[in-house]
Amino acid sequence: MQITENVRDIMRSPEYVLNSLTEHSENLNYKFERLYRIFFNEEMYYVAYQRIYAKPGNMTAGADGKTIDQMSLNRIEQLITSLKDESYQPQPSKRMYIPKKNGKMRPLGVPAFNDKLLQEVVRMILEAIYERQFEKTSHGFRPLRSCHTALSDIQKTFSGVKWFVEGDIKGFFDNINHEILIGILKERIADERFIRLIRKFLNAGYIEDWNFHNSYSGTPQGGIVSPILANIYLDKLDKFMKEYTCLLYTSDAAD
């Protein structure tokens, strides 16, 4: 009996759950099912809370006026109950603006307390599934990667190059096509409840100047799950460019 309980505890541990997802992610033909039940594991929220609390920017109050430091076991239990019967509905994010380097303002969407906590659990799950399939040339919003690792790779790979072209996808986060994103997720995830939850986040809308606005496209900057969704979306572009570059090299070699 004690052995059975110990095994059950190990299998419930967030580390075990996420490592199991990562191991299966190596097989690109593997379809992930029954992901949604991970949200019923209280321990996932303890880990999520610790990770969020470690980042000062995540302490900003959402549209509900509450911060992540107001967590309690009762709140987690209520959240899990609403997830089990799928009555959970994310609140609209609070729109605020921060200055950009060019003097313009960048819109951010700050999620409500419960949404922030749940988004971190979603982010951990998606990272475990997708991180190893991302291209090595991708450095944004990834563990142990940054603009500094990108510059280091450029220095090593393009030592003889004198000119570089810098580009930006205008309004990228605001213009992500929801249906395309959902289609990409379904290539690896065969869990409709999990997909429906992602849709809820995408369609939650935002509040600005006390007015509600629908979100027909995009995923708000400032949302905890937004960066990983953006990387999943852009991974298709990375893989296309990798294949295109290989074709160019092949063509040059043939000439």
Question: Language model features by range: what are they?
Answer:
Residues 1-77:
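Non-catalytic, polymerase-adjacent accessory regions of viral genome-replication enzymes
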Residues 52, 82-104, 113, 117-125, ...:
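Reverse-transcriptase-like RNA-dependent polymerase core
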Residues 249-255:
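Conserved small/polar residues in nucleotide/adenosyl-binding loops
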Residues 56-69, 90-117, 133-145, 165-166, ...:
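Short, conserved non-catalytic motifs in the polymerase core
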Residues 58-67, 109, 148-185:
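Conserved catalytic palm subdomain of right-hand nucleotidyl-transferase polymerases, strongest
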Residues 12, 16, 30, 34, ...:
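Generic recognition of stable, solvent-exposed alpha-helical segments in well-folded globular domains
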Residues 174, 179-248:
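Nucleotidyl polymerases of mobile genetic elements and RNA viruses
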Residues 126-132, 191:
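Short helix-interrupting loop/turn segments at helix-coil junctions
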